[in-house]
Design a protein with these regions (language model features):
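Conserved HGGG/HGGXW glycine-rich cap/lid loop of the alpha/beta-hydrolase fold
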Residues: 120-172, 430
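Non-catalytic accessory segments flanking enzyme active sites
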Residues: 45-117, 333-336, 340-355
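Alpha/beta-hydrolase
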Residues: 26-46, 51-52, 56, 225-330
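Short, Lys/Arg-enriched N-terminal segments with co-localized hydrophobic residues
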Residues: 14-24
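Conserved hydrolase catalytic core segment
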Residues: 144, 148-150, 197-249
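C-terminal subdomain of alpha/beta-hydrolase-fold enzymes, centered on the catalytic histidine
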Residues: 280-435
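Glycine-rich "HGGG/HGxG" loop immediately N-terminal to the catalytic nucleophile
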Residues: 88-90, 153, 162, 166-181, ...
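Conserved acidic catalytic loop of the alpha/beta-hydrolase fold
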Residues: 184-203
Length: 435
């Protein structure tokens, strides 16, 4: 079930491979850059396998239920498969089914994937991922957004899809010369990329997690250059501001007179987010020394979040196959990106967001939002309640919201877990805002 404040669109069929589209729907457009495929060296992959072979697991008794974190036995199985069964070259070939580019933007090397739109008038759409995701977490929605007709949709809804890697999160490699990188500074890079580098006069934007904050900042600072934005959370842009921004509970008390269900939900969400925010904001560099040296340790840290944040019903394989997990982990490993990816959290607080103007709402670009009940606040149970809680609450005042939806299926990264819902919601946000 789902709830929204606008009319539903079409569910999407399974993805086609790149190259299977109807060429008659192509809208030619000269692109100003030459593609550059992803290629990880044999030496880097050999070093990865050697390190996996030398993995020394910790003593981990009494943890089969994940109550102490990732169980050693579960991780051992994935590490063995990473060493003996997983084939990065297969994943690399799938990734290279799309165009890839690396271009300097204000001196920062930026990698992005491009999928040309196929329709009468595609509009450019930049999609931004979060942590611990990579650009490849958008892979389930790229083709339907670029070529709606191939999936039973309206070709008038086509986008030219641009999917960058957040600097310091993956390709082209570790981020240097930008130690103060954070979400609002990336928004400036993205605007320069889309307008000055790629030559788009106007564009659309979407994002989840950190990517939602990047996208909201675009909608705040560069609203006149946007058709609109679509995001997977309604966090205010000052979410990481303040002396205790690492406290996910925001000082909410636990009292004996709270309803049991409310109390349980508060505790559940604190457990889901507390260690992530606290470590990344306070001493991420300390942890990074271990994660940068041990692929098994890196996988464990990522895996804890993929398991806790996905709507998997106790079965992680229902959301991510082993190959899915290891493709994303391999991107982090071969690029040496874990330390700089975690730096975004501390820097969002150390270099706090400040408004670029005093107009209200803060995010003036037309905004669509997609929520999932898996992340409902305490006391909110249904999709209708989730939509109502947002539209009547303080976060809504930040946004020029034009399309708010909630769905029963999906977790923290909705475009991966429920791509059909994300596609439908995003199309609805922009359907009447195209030229």
């Amino acid at each position: 079930m789902s709830a929204n404040l606008a009319r539903h669109g079409h569910a999407q069929p399974p993805l086609l491979l790149p190259g299977e589209e109807n060429p008659a729907m192509t809208t030619p457009r000269a692109f100003p850059l030459e593609p550059r495929p992803i290629q990880v060296s044999d030496e880097v992959l050999a070093d990865l396998r050697a390190r996996l072979a030398r993995t020394r697991p910790p003593v981990d008794e009494g943890n089969d239920d994940w109550s102490y974190g990732v169980p050693a036995g579960y991780l051992r199985g994935l590490v063995d498969y990473w060493h003996d069964g997983y084939d990065w070259r297969t994943a690399e070939a799938a990734i290279n089914g799309y165009e890839h580019y690396v271009v300097p933007v204000d001196g920062i090397p930026v990698h992005f994937l491009r999928r040309p739109g196929r329709g009468p008038r595609p509009i450019p759409l930049i999609l931004t991922h979060g942590w611990p995701w990579t650009f490849w977490h958008w892979s389930k929605v790229i083709d339907p957004l670029a070529d709606p007709a191939a999936f039973g949709g309206d070709p008038a809804d086509a986008f030219e899809v641009i999917v960058p890697s957040l600097p310091g999160f993956g390709f082209p490699g570790p981020l240097t010369g930008f130690p103060d990188v954070n979400f609002w500074k990336v928004a400036d890079l993205w605007h320069t990329l889309m307008t000055d580098t790629l030559g788009y006069e106007k564009y659309a934007a979407g994002g989840c997690d950190i990517g939602a904050l990047v996208t909201s900042q675009l909608g705040h600072k560069y609203a006149d250059a946007l058709y609109g934005i679509h995001i997977g959370s309604g966090l205010p842009l000052d979410f990481f501001t303040g002396p205790r921004a690492w406290d996910f509970a925001r000082g909410r008390p636990l009292s004996d007179d709270q309803p049991a269900a409310i109390r349980a939900r508060i505790i559940e969400q604190d457990r889901r987010w507390a260690s992530h925010l606290t470590v990344h904001m306070l001493d991420g560099a300390t942890l990074a020394h271990g994660l940068a040296d041990s692929p098994a340790g890196l996988l464990a840290w990522l895996l804890e979040r993929w398991n806790a944040w996905s709507d998997n019903g106790g079965d992680l394989a229902s959301v991510f196959t082993k190959d899915d997990l290891l493709t994303h982990a391999t991107i982090y490993w071969v690029t040496g990106a874990i330390a700089t990816s975690m730096r975004y959290y501390a820097n969002a607080n150390r270099y706090p967001w400040t408004p670029s103007h005093g107009r209200t709402p803060v995010v003036q670009a037309p905004t669509g939002l997609t929520f999932v009940t898996y992340e409902n606040p305490p006391g909110i149970h249904t999709t209708d309640e989730r939509v109502a809680a947002f539209t009547s609450g303080p976060q809504a005042t930040w946004f020029h919201h034009v399309n708010v939806s909630a769905h029963d299926h999906g977790g923290h990264f909705i475009p991966w877990e429920n791509p059909a819902a994300w596609i439908t919601d995003l199309r609805r946000t922009f359907h009447t805002r195209r030229p």
